[in-house]
């Protein structure tokens, strides 16, 4: 009713920006007639106008018109009006919800160009290395054409490469790289090692997956700590012996385990100890982790074992996360359970959550296909509004009602039958599963039915062909099983993707002749074949060294090339070999050549032009087949998407559904569920179990019931609220850490940038003298009772150069005078110390100051992080004592922080006065410090 009276708030918001869109359209004709050079010249003109005091908002219509025209010339893509609208929403620092296939990637070029004109840098954030690389090459052409520099950060880059790329006008980077670089910069020992500039503006692609799904996981940089391996092994044996429900309870919802009294007794008995919590010989932590590893962390669901290593599988995207480890000894417990080699445990050196990382940007915008459901969270935590952008063409997707089965076996049987029916009809099918294990179960069922299909999950052999599989998922009769399709960057095009096939063909001929021999197998890594840029973020490792062939699976190509086209292709490659040299380019550079050849950007390199001609000819031949197939597939109903389990959030379900019916194509989606699914089991509660028994049906008969659908929706809402509360709590607790982190990092940066730290150290020394005076002098007592002897002793402990100081020198002074006197003494002593040290090597004192301050900040901050973790664990219990744990955490955390700051000061003063360089050692030490 309110909506009718007031109008839709979203429509009102979009209406506000409509005049800008009209203005951009009016400028189109005027910009179209400019030559390439004149169009490029616009960038310098905009920069001058900014320098003269115009605001970015004033430049917006003309700048967007320029980007639209550049996109048309370089990529052959012209921004639709709805894309311009999305670009405006991003520029004003909001989230634009745009449906899958509406060209989100192209939208990002608008605000990133406009905001890069300030020269302060723009970050375009994607979810993985491959997407960052694809966008930097593909969309980066627009920016390069307009004269802006484009940077790309990849996980394998060196610090100097990172520095160069962050200094560009626009940098494409993943969320984790930006976070880890931020943390590493705040551990750097000299400004030369700092790679990032101050944050300015960022556009986040798949913003919901980064700011919401990933918000619970902090980024952690850690160092190694030795822990007893045998304890993990013993604990694993004990966990194996203990029985669920008798010795311990499992709380699946909170992902935690609790020992019962019998469990404690049994574990203590098996270990031969009297108390699991004995501080001298603590066992509780090891036993709890071992039980968690047994009950809550399942092989092929939460992790896979590869080459003797336990590798985490990302629960949201189903990709493997090599190099990431669970903390707190959990990873070691899983290694013990799997009888793999136990790696040393780690200690946190620096940490930040994505929530706080992205709040460091003065302005940020984000894009996603699904954000409206989480709008309250975006507004509450990030102060980001969500605007829903209308689609360019009407949606023709149909979401069919859920099929619910009594058992899991019944459900999977029905899914396999549905795949078979669709395959018979010739409709492509995409099945989304939630784990590696389930995707392989379905694969086995389809094999029995003799249905050809592709499998895409975290296993290395499949990861390598990821884009190849996805790009062909729209072919007639194709059946594709994929673990969580969220955020997979390749579009599913009905009838198959001819551009992609042509690029693969070009790579097949080009790469083996051009890439350096040692470059292709030094990784022992096979790069995923033919991702639109051939880089997959180093996901798929292959055991042993393996020389690559770059040959794609022959069944991908719809037809054999004609003799003329094949000759054209071979000739183009021969010209390239003559120009670049036989097998002489690094792999990434060769990939770039293929990428540029496959695009439309204006270019004058004759070799690339020849390759482009060949590529276009190949594409035309394939297109005759794919266009025909596209029309056939559209005629029989388009892509059918099957969901096999409801996810923790409706948003991820919607992402899967969004794969069907892109850009006005037809399509259908349906979820198959069983009453044994995790979501219903953990959150549906007894009500569902009761329903179960009430339905006396066969296991392969679907149940349709309004009550059941409501239970389902209720369960999902419950999960969303539950996880939202967890994220909110993570955020509130991390907010406390965040203020401390900002303070300590600001102090650290001042030290790094500071040319002369002498004043700072003297301030530390004076403050330390004040602390000593305040500790030993009680101003409520008469001056004769002040403990001057102890005070002088303490001063000498810190500053041995004041050995001649006597208590009687202070007898007739007031507290203020004593402090002033000690300040003066400590300054004199410091000058003396400096003279001594600089005799060993001139300027050494300055190096020593920086070294000791950074060293103490880093060491004590590390210890502080551990104390804060311990505090957070312990305040949880105070809720029972009617105290608010968060308030307790804030006040005690603040006390701990102040203590740490005092200790940093005192340690630095003590270390510098005690510092005794030996001439020959010093030459070494200083070279280490610098």
Swiss-Prot record:
UniProt KW keywords: ATP-binding, Cell inner membrane, Cell membrane, Cytoplasm, Membrane, Nucleotide-binding, Protein transport, Thylakoid, Translocase, Translocation, Transport
Residues engaged in binding ATP: 83, 101-105, 491
CDD domains membership: DEXDc_SecA, SF2_C_secA
GO biological process: intracellular protein transmembrane transport; protein import; protein targeting; protein transport by the Sec complex
Pfam family membership, one: SecA_DEAD
Membrane topology reported for the UniProt record: Peripheral membrane protein
Cellular component aspect of the GO annotation: cell envelope Sec protein transport complex; cytosol; plasma membrane-derived thylakoid membrane
Enzyme Commission designation: 7.4.2.8
SUPFAM superfamilies for this protein: Helical scaffold and wing domains of SecA, P-loop containing nucleoside triphosphate hydrolases, Pre-protein crosslinking domain of SecA
Family: Belongs to the SecA family.
Protein function: Part of the Sec protein translocase complex. Interacts with the SecYEG preprotein conducting channel. Has a central role in coupling the hydrolysis of ATP to the transfer of proteins into and across the cell membrane, serving as an ATP-driven molecular motor driving the stepwise translocation of polypeptide chains across the membrane.
Assembly information from the UniProt record: Monomer and homodimer. Part of the essential Sec protein translocation apparatus which comprises SecA, SecYEG and auxiliary proteins SecDF. Other proteins may also be involved.
Protein name, entry field: Protein translocase subunit SecA
Organism: Nostoc punctiforme (strain ATCC 29133 / PCC 73102)
Lineage: Bacteria, Bacillati, Cyanobacteriota, Cyanophyceae, Nostocales
């Amino acid at each position: 009713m309110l909506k009718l009276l007031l109008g839709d708030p979203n429509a009102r918001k979009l209406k506000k920006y409509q005049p800008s869109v009209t203005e951009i359209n009016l400028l189109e004709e005027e910009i179209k007639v400019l030559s390439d050079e004149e169009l490029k010249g616009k960038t310098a003109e905009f920069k001058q106008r900014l320098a003269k005091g115009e605001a970015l908002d004033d430049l917006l219509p003309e700048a967007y018109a320029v980007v639209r025209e550049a996109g048309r010339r370089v990529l052959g893509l012209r921004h639709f009006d709805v894309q311009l609208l999305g670009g405006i929403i991003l520029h004003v620092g909001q989230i634009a919800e745009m449906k899958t296939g509406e060209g989100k990637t192209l939208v990002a070029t608008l605000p990133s160009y406009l905001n890069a004109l300030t020269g302060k840098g723009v970050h375009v954030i994607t979810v993985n290395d491959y997407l960052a690389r694809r966008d930097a090459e593909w969309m980066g052409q627009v920016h390069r054409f307009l004269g802006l520099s484009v940077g790309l950060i990849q996980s394998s880059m060196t610090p100097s490469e990172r520095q160069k790329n962050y200094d560009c006008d626009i940098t494409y980077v993943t969320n984790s790289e930006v976070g880890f670089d931020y943390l590493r910069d705040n551990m750097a020992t000299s400004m030369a090692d700092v790679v990032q500039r101050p944050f300015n503006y960022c556009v986040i692609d798949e913003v919901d997956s980064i700011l919401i799904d990933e918000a619970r996981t902090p980024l952690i940089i850690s160092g190694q700590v030795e822990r007893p391996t045998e304890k993990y092994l013993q604990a694993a044996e004990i966990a194996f012996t203990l029985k669920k429900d008798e010795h311990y309870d499992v709380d699946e919802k909170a992902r935690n385990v609790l020992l019962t009294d019998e469990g404690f007794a049994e574990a203590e008995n098996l270990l031969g100890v009297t108390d699991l919590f004995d501080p001298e010989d603590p066992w509780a932590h090891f036993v709890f982790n071992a039980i968690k590893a047994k009950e809550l962390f399942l092989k092929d669901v939460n992790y896979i074992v590869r080459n003797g290593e336990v590798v985490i599988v990302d629960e949201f995207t189903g990709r493997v996360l090599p190099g990431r480890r669970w903390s707190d000894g959990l990873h070691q417990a899983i290694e013990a359970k799997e009888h793999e080699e136990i790696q040393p445990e780690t200690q946190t050196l620096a940490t930040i959550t994505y929530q706080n990382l992205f709040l460091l940007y003065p302005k940020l915008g984000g894009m996603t296909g699904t954000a409206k459901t989480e709008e309250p969270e975006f507004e509450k935590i990030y102060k980001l509004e969500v605007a829903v952008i209308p689609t360019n063409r009407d949606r023709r997707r149909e979401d069919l009602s859920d099929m619910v089965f009594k058992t899991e076996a019944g459900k999977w049987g029905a899914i396999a039958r549905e795949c078979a029916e669709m395959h018979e009809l010739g409709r492509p099918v995409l099945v989304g599963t939630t784990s590696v294990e389930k995707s392989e179960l379905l694969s086995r069922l389809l094999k029995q039915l003799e249905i050809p299909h592709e499998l895409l999950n975290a296993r290395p052999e499949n990861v390598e062909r990821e884009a190849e599989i996805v790009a062909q998922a729209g072919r007639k009769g194709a059946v594709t099983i994929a673990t969580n399709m969220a955020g997979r960057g390749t579009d599913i095009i009905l009838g198959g993707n001819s551009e992609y096939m042509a690029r693969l063909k070009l790579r097949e001929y080009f790469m083996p002749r051009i890439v350096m021999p040692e470059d292709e197998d030094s990784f022992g890594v096979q790069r995923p074949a033919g991702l639109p840029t051939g880089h997959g973020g180093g996901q798929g490792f292959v055991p042993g060294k393996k020389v690559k062939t770059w040959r794609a699976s022959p069944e991908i190509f719809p037809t054999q090339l004609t003799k003329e086209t094949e000759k054209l292709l071979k000739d183009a490659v021969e010209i390239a070999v003559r120009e670049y040299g036989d097998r002489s380019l690094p792999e990434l550079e060769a990939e770039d050549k293929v990428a540029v050849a496959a695009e439309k950007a204006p270019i004058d390199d004759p070799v690339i032009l020849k390759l482009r001609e060949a590529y276009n000819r190949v594409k035309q031949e394939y297109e005759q087949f794919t266009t025909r197939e596209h029309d056939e597939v559209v005629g029989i109903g388009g892509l059918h998407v099957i969901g096999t389990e409801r996810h923790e959030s409706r948003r991820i379900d919607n992402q899967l559904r969004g794969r069907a019916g892109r850009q006005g194509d037809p399509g259908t989606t349906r979820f198959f569920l069983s009453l044994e699914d995790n979501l219903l089991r953990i959150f549906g509660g007894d009500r569902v179990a009761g329903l179960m028994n009430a339905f006396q049906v066969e296991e392969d008969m679907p149940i349709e019931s309004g009550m059941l659908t409501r239970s389902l929706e209720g369960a999902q809402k419950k999960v969303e609220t539950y996880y939202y509360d967890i994220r909110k709590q993570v955020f509130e607790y991390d907010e406390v850490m965040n203020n401390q982190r900002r303070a300590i990092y600001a102090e650290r940066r001042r030290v790094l940038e500071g040319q002369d730290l002498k004043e700072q150290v003297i301030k530390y020394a004076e403050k330390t003298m004040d602390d000593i005076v305040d500790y030993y002098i009680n101003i409520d007592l008469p001056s004769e009772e002040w403990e001057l002897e102890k005070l002088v002793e303490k001063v000498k402990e810190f500053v041995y150069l004041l050995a001649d100081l006597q208590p009687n020198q202070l007898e007739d002074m007031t507290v203020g005078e004593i402090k002033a006197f000690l300040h003066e003494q400590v300054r004199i002593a410091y000058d003396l110390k400096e003279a001594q040290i600089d005799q060993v090597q001139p300027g050494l004192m300055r190096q020593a100051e920086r070294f000791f301050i950074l060293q103490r900040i880093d060491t004590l901050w590390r210890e502080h992080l551990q104390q804060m973790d311990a505090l957070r664990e312990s305040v949880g219990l105070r809720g029972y004592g009617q105290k608010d744990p968060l308030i307790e955490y804030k006040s005690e955390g603040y006390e701990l922080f102040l203590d740490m700051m005092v200790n940093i000061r005192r340690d630095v003063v003590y270390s510098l006065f005690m510092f005794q360089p030996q001439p020959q050692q010093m030459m070494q030490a200083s070279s280490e410090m610098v």
